[in-house]
Amino acid sequence: MVVKFTKSEALHKEALEHIVGGVNSPSRSFKAVGGGAPVAMERGKGAYFWDVDGNKYIDYLAAYGPIITGHAHPHITKAITTAAENGVLYGTPTALEVKFAKMLKEAMPALDKVRFVNSGTEAVMTTIRVARAYTGRTKIMKFAGCYHGHSDLVLVAAGSGPSTLGTPDSAGVPQSIAQEVITVPFNNVETLKEALDKWGHEVAAILVEPIVGNFGIVEPKPGFLEKVNELVHEAGALVIYDEVITAFRFMYGGAQDLLGVTPDLTALGKVIGGGLPIGAYGGKKEIMEQVAPLGPAYQAGTMAGNPASMASGIACLEVLQQEGLYEKLDELGAMLEKGILEQAEKHNIDITLNRLKGALTVYFTTNTIEDYDAAQDTDGEMFGKFFKLMLQEGINLAPSKYEAWFLTTEHTKEDIEYTIEAVGRAFAALANNK
């Protein structure tokens, strides 16, 4: 298959004249996969994309996770259309937001109270504010490599040591803010304990991806999350789960429900919006009552709880309640995993594959991936070549070695079979060019 990107290239050239970097999120650029014009999509339906040149793709990007029910799902599309016809924004309470809040609470028992915002970044940012208000402390802990949005406090990477006060990971983030963040490696209890022994009395909360999604799919070691809860609570701090990626991705509910570990606060986004902008946060009643108008922690938003996003979210959860959907995602994920591993062995390509149900990551390495350091130490150049080869095969992946492949409820066994064949051809090409 020879895929041409003439119109995408022309559109990107034009975009560079008007949009910073030609993209509205840096993750959409092809900088991490060797450069070039990113492919511009024109429409999506089910598990498929069509770009501006008319090329068709099987989509494993799923908009970085939200599109679990596939593109333009009729039930969700109808709900959005109805909401739009009734007016997309009121600036008042609505019945839709109450219904949606109840649905989230029923699905995730740790949510005594919830509040809607407009993005995962907002949700995480506000849980931090609430935790600080509740504890009277200022420092935050996070795990290296875990992305929690682009607000100043969480755009922090680890410094030179295994546990350290943070250094800014972006220009424009003051060192004074970064020093409020303590970064430790994921899946390492001893380093976490050392950091809490040193700074625990200053820590308001720890941010946790219960299943990591931002340096690939990485599961916690057995007992790790339970130990995090124990140590953090002993220090008098709160546990915040960032479930922006994980909630409703692996089961109807949160990763916390799948794993049986309960946080104090939870941040949500992505899947719960059915493809429209959304965020939410919630948790224990006594903590959430710190939020205005009941408490002193201020948070507001003109678009928060807007009818279109509420309707889309309700419809998405209604679809996900259908029997057998998550079992299908797991079955297709297992089929894809098996096929990719077989092709890697056949063509003598070194990979490690991490999968949980309908999400997986292919790393070009022989090492086990349990933390960010291991994920960094993988072959990004090889991934970039693989990514470009897969585009030529009509397979759309995220343009980064750190990102997951996301299955949707609309993928079929035939899609998986074709994808495995495409992986085989890509691996053969890589093997011939070693």
From Swiss-Prot:
EC numbers on record: 5.4.3.8
Highest taxon, organism lineage: Bacteria
Any one of the GO CC terms: cytoplasm
Keywords: Cytoplasm, Isomerase, Porphyrin biosynthesis, Pyridoxal phosphate
Pfam families per record: Aminotran_3
Reaction(s) catalysed by this chain's protein: (S)-4-amino-5-oxopentanoate = 5-aminolevulinate
Subcellular location: Cytoplasm
Xref: CDD domains: OAT_like
Subunit organization: Homodimer.
UniProt similarity note: Belongs to the class-III pyridoxal-phosphate-dependent aminotransferase family. HemL subfamily.
PANTHER family (alphabetical): GLUTAMATE-1-SEMIALDEHYDE 2,1-AMINOMUTASE, GLUTAMATE-1-SEMIALDEHYDE 2,1-AMINOMUTASE 2
Name listed for the protein in its UniProt record: Glutamate-1-semialdehyde 2,1-aminomutase 1
Protein species of origin: Bacillus cereus (strain AH187)
